[in-house]
Curated annotation (Swiss-Prot):
Protein known as: 1-deoxy-D-xylulose 5-phosphate reductoisomerase
Pathway: Isoprenoid biosynthesis; isopentenyl diphosphate biosynthesis via DXP pathway; isopentenyl diphosphate from 1-deoxy-D-xylulose 5-phosphate: step 1/6
Binding residue positions for NADPH: 10-13, 38, 121, 123, 201
Gene this chain is encoded by: dxr
Record-listed Mn(2+) binding positions: 147, 149, 217
Taxonomic lineage of the native organism: Bacteria, Pseudomonadati, Pseudomonadota, Gammaproteobacteria, Candidatus Pseudothioglobaceae
EC number: 1.1.1.267
Catalytic activity from the UniProt record: 2-C-methyl-D-erythritol 4-phosphate + NADP(+) = 1-deoxy-D-xylulose 5-phosphate + NADPH + H(+)
Enzyme class: oxidoreductase
Length: 383
């Protein structure tokens, strides 16, 4: 029986994790659940799973939960509680599924405690990849990616890295793969949020539409698998059946295929090196549409090009790009800038920011805040 500390229990990754736990209550126990403000759903989860701890990051939400809960679950609040519980001696696995910079500290604390971290928090690698991966090595932590493309690479690399030539991340191409660039200016937020294959939140849907999401995954792969930028390739694959591939020097290519469902990835991270039932039915190749693959159009999808340039630049450039993208997408979703403005704003912010190399999470967070403020100033030129 493995004790799981689930950070971000009320989000989509959290819900999928719990659905896998439900199938294997003989193997996994929920030790801790965390959420930000959704105390109503947390109450339901506490009643069902009866964890030792429930953490509401928002203090007032924690107070509301503690006044109404009837189980023996201990209610905690604040980010420091997250940092403590991931390092608890009874925590075996940590599902790090808190979105954004808010999830970095607890993920790093889990690493420093030498836990198995099932990493769904992108920012830990995009913003603090050097810091994070050095800690993984130093504290002998076990890092397993919770992302369909990176999980695919992780699985394909189980045969070893000898003769590894390159990896290839697949991208759906988003809803505008076949839309002429001349029409990009008129794309609306609702159109950008209509992803063809995956059910996602609005921000990540826009990232998929600009292909920034794939650019961020390129940066994650660079750190996760200790690669050079030249060893990372992207191919557009609209069906999202092939999740990623690994190319070897002998001419062999290993790919991981499956239905687009995060439960497959999560169950693999939880059971590794074994495999367990995820609740997802197997792919039927005789009933699968024709698989298409295209080279990405860097002129149409400038954000992907920017991500490769940023990776080559290194230092705080990834922090700046991520911050500028988040602010630009927020303004786009609020109808304050158009779709084509997103990469322009990111590029301008990258040019304006001073280039440094952060050495701590505090420096990373500070750099992130400065980049966000600079992006807001740059956006004032638009509209």
């Amino acid at each position: 029986m493995k004790n799981i500390t689930l950070l971000g229990a009320t989000g989509s990754i959290g819900k999928s994790t719990l659905s896998v736990v439900d199938l294997h209550s003989d193997k996994f126990n929920i030790f801790t659940l965390s959420a930000n403000t959704n105390w109503q759903l947390m109450l339901e989860l506490c009643n069902k799973y009866q964890p030792n701890y429930a953490i509401m990051v928002d203090e007032s939400s924690a107070e509301k939960l503690s006044t109404i809960i009837t189980t023996d679950t201990q209610i905690l609040s604040g980010t420091q509680a997250l940092d403590k519980v991931v390092a608890h001696q009874d925590t075996d696995f940590v599902m790090a599924a808190i979105v954004g910079t808010a999830g970095m500290s607890s993920a790093l604390c889990a690493v420093k405690a030498g836990k198995r971290i099932m990493l769904a928090n992108k920012e830990s690698l995009i913003l603090a990849g050097d810091i994070f991966m050095k800690a993984v090595e130093e504290f002998n932590a076990e890092l397993i990616p919770v992302d369909s493309e990176h999980s695919a690479i992780f699985q394909c690399l189980q045969s070893g890295r000898s003769g590894l030539n390159k990896i290839q991340l697949t991208a759906s191409g988003g809803p505008f793969l076949h839309t002429p660039i001349s029409k990009f200016k008129y794309i609306t937020p609702n159109q950008a949020c209509a992803h063809p294959n995956w059910s996602m939140g609005r921000k990540i849907s826009v990232d998929s539409a600009t292909m920034m999401n794939k650019g961020l995954e390129v940066i994650e792969a660079y750190y996760l698998f200790s690669l050079t930028p030249e060893q990372i390739d992207v191919v557009v694959h609209p069906q999202s059946i092939v999740h990623s591939s690994v190319y070897y020097k002998d001419g062999s290519t290993l790919s991981q295929l499956g239905k687009p469902d995060m439960r497959t990835v999560i169950s693999y991270a939880m059971s590794y090196p074994q495999r367990i039932n995820s609740g997802v039915t197997a792919l039927d190749l005789t009933n699968t549409p024709a698989l298409e693959f295209y080279q990405p159009d860097f002129e149409k999808f400038t954000c992907l090009k920017l991500a490769f340039e940023t990776l080559n630049k290194g230092g705080n450039a990834m922090i700046t790009m991520n911050a500028a993208n988040e602010i630009a997408v927020e303004y786009f979703l609020n109808h304050q800038i158009n779709f084509l403005d997103i990469p322009k704003i990111i590029d301008q912010t990258l040019s304006a920011m001073k280039h440094t190399t952060p050495n701590s999470l505090e420096e990373v967070v500070n750099n992130d805040l400065v980049a966000r403020e600079m992006t807001r100033e740059i956006i004032k030129q638009y509209g």
